[in-house]
Structures are given as C-alpha cells and as structure tokens.
C-alpha cells in the first residue's frame, strides 16, 4: 500500500490542472497517476505515470475505484466517481477546487440526477461556466491544503 497517491480522471481534466499536478508531484515527491482512454503527454518523472484504459462507459472510473485507497486523492468532475471514492474512504476534489465530502456528495448526486432528468426531457440546462483563473486558484489552494496535510 502506498501511503499517498493522486489519481486523475484525466480525459476531462483541464490542461492547466494537469500541469499544476505535474509540478506538485515533482515538488512534493507524491505519486501521480493519470487514467484515460487515450494516450496523454506526461513529463518524464519517477512520480508521474499514466494508465490507458479501453474506451467505454466509465472504464477509467472503474479502474480508479478498483485501485484507490483511503489515503489517496482523486481529481475528478465526475460526481458518481467521487461518491465511490468517498465510499472507499479516499478524498475527491474537482478541478474547480471543490472537495467532495460525505456531507455534500448526496446533494451533489441528487442535483446531478435532477439535471440529467431535465435534459432527458428536452429542457436545455446549459453547461458549467468556462474554466477560469479563479477556478484554477481555488484548485491550487485545495491541492496545497491536502499536500501540506499529507507531507508533514
């Protein structure tokens, strides 16, 4: 069991977040694993690796769930994946810096399902706001808090 590790649901993770994670992995010597259904560009590093999974619905998510441990952090905007990660005792952080917790994950799942129902009935709900500098800063702050806690 590795004490600390960061997993990334990498297919949908914004590039500025991946770049930040690459730097953090090197700076703090924390293993970083990007999981995607396509090859990614990752810098050469003993701390950074990638896993290419087959294409298909939730294949990357399932790989992460199968390998995550309680001391790990998962970066994902996928709320059902975050729920599974939390069930396993690990932490989940979205690319906008919001930490998913046992206190907020049920509400997030309910809202996600509600919005999905609206979309399937033909209601246009719009998408998330464009990824902003404020989102990047919020993510950096949340990541730094986790890194400080685990690297004491």
UniProtKB/Swiss-Prot annotation:
It comes from Shewanella sp. (strain MR-7). InterPro entries: UPF0178. This is UPF0178 protein Shewmr7_1635. It holds the Pfam family DUF188. PANTHER family: UPF0178 PROTEIN YAII. Belongs to the UPF0178 family. CDD domains: PIN_YqxD-like. HAMAP family: UPF0178 (MF_00489). It comes from the Bacteria.
């Amino acid at each position: 069991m590795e004490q600390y590790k960061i997993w990334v649901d990498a297919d949908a993770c914004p590039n500025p977040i991946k770049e930040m994670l690459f730097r953090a992995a090197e700076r703090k010597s924390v293993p970083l694993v990007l999981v995607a259904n396509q090859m990614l560009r990752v810098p050469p590093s003993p701390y950074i690796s990638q896993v290419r999974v087959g294409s298909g619905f939730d294949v990357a998510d399932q790989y992460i769930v199968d390998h995550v441990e309680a001391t790990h952090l998962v970066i994902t905007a996928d709320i059902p994946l975050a729920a599974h990660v939390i069930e396993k005792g690990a932490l989940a952080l979205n690319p906008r810096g919001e930490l998913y917790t046992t206190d907020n994950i049920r509400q997030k799942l309910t809202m996600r399902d509600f919005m999905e129902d609206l979309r399937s009935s033909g209601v246009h709900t719009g998408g998330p706001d464009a990824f902003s500098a404020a989102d990047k800063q919020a993510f950096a702050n949340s990541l730094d808090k986790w890194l400080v806690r685990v690297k004491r």
